[in-house]
Amino acid sequence: MPRYAIIDSDTASDDTIAILLASKFFKLLGITIVAGNVKFENEIKNALFTVEYFNLDVPVFIGSSRPIMGKWSTVEEVHGNNGIGDWKIEEPKISPEKEHAIDAIIRLSKEYEGELEILAVSPLTNLALAYLKDPTIVKRIKKVWIMGGAFSRGNTTPIAEFNFWVDPEAA
């Protein structure tokens, strides 16, 4: 039986690897983009480039371009200005979907009720906003896998991990 997933991503180099790995184990129903690692337009471009370059049949949905509250901080010093180590990539020929990521998450949770898994490798803004728009979503999602939090030391501050730090209200 196939496993169905959405990847919620702030597409930098680490997330492109996550997309490729996940595509081998899940039927990816979408990549939802959220503000995180680098400039938002670069995150969108990186997701589209990854899908196109590796010939993945996965729609890309644009989500929240800022945290729920507070100031958005990026980490170009970690991922390069474009999010993938300043590797020069071509402009993607494909475009993102017109449907907003939050609406896509809610819709897909209904279409794949009890089967949908969320692979959140980014700040949790899109997921929090989807929940605020439709609190019943939690009953329809099978699992949420989160790349976030810190057990002992953070990667952004001594105690905070980036994905939770950039939008703590969403986490």
Curated annotation (Swiss-Prot):
InterPro entries, per database record: I/U_nuclsd_hydro_CS, Inosine/uridine_hydrolase_dom, IUN_hydrolase, Ribo_hydro-like
Keyword list, A-Z: Glycosidase, Hydrolase
UniProt KW Amino-acid biosynthesis keyword: no
GO-annotated molecular function: hydrolase activity, hydrolyzing N-glycosyl compounds
Pfam assignment, any one: IU_nuc_hydro
Signal sequence, renumbered to the chain: none
Family according to the record: Belongs to the IUNH family.
Name this polypeptide is given: Uncharacterized protein in bps2 5'region
Organism ancestry: Archaea, Thermoproteota, Thermoprotei, Sulfolobales, Sulfolobaceae
